[in-house]
Amino acid sequence: MKLLFLAFIICSFATTSLYGQSREAPVAPPLKEAENSSTAQKYFSDVVLVNQHGQQFRFYSDLLNGKVVVISSFMATCTSACPVKNRNLEKLQEAAGDRLGKDVFILSISVDPVTDTPERLKEYAKTYHAKPGWHFLTGKKENVDWALYKIGQYVPEKENHFNVLVIGNESTGLWKKAFGLAKAEDLTIVFASVLNDKAPAKN
């Protein structure tokens, strides 16, 4: 029964597209690609996002490349599903241990970047005892929408945001989705499977 439940809360990206894009695309922001960009960098792009401390990050190069990430979409004014998801993320933050902020990061991306300013998100993050390595991200709407689109979390109407966590190990290429409102202990199992994934040994 436990395995069946885990199968229910996990869905592989392979069942949709490579990274599970949303069906409806936002307007693409101006994008610049380096000549030596990797396939992953070209896909995810380096749109600039801003965290709760006002720090700027390139989406792929700074936030994803070589890292284990748990990504969630939310908005600070959500009072139903988002608090539940964020409490689960608080549990995953503890599960990450001293790797949080080193090679493991939690990325909570606002679907309401106009309202969710860095200042507002800084106060919001305190509610969930966010430690260094848990970024609450906002920025220009076109950049935020594009980042969400690339992880399959973009919605035209912010009230319809997803209750799905995207959990990935960029180094090994293992990506999973999990129901963000599931029990924290079940999400921890999914997180651990991605965290502990190893790249195949080279001959």
Give names to the regions the model predicted.
Residues 1-50, 197, 201-203:
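N-terminal targeting signals for export/organelle localization
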Residues 48-52, 167-168:
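Hydrophobic beta-strand positions
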Residues 59-83, 89:
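Short active-site neighborhood of thiol/selenol oxidoreductases, capturing the structured segment around
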Residues 66-68, 84-108:
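Conserved helix-turn-beta segment immediately C-terminal to the redox Cys motif
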Residues 94-101, 126-130, 149-153, 192, ...:
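Sec-exported extracytoplasmic/periplasmic mature domains
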Residues 103-116, 132-144:
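Thiol-based oxidoreductase modules, predominantly thioredoxin-like and allied folds used
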Residues 122-162:
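Short, internal strand/loop/helix patches
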Residues 160-203:
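Thiol-/selenol-based redox modules, centered on thioredoxin-like
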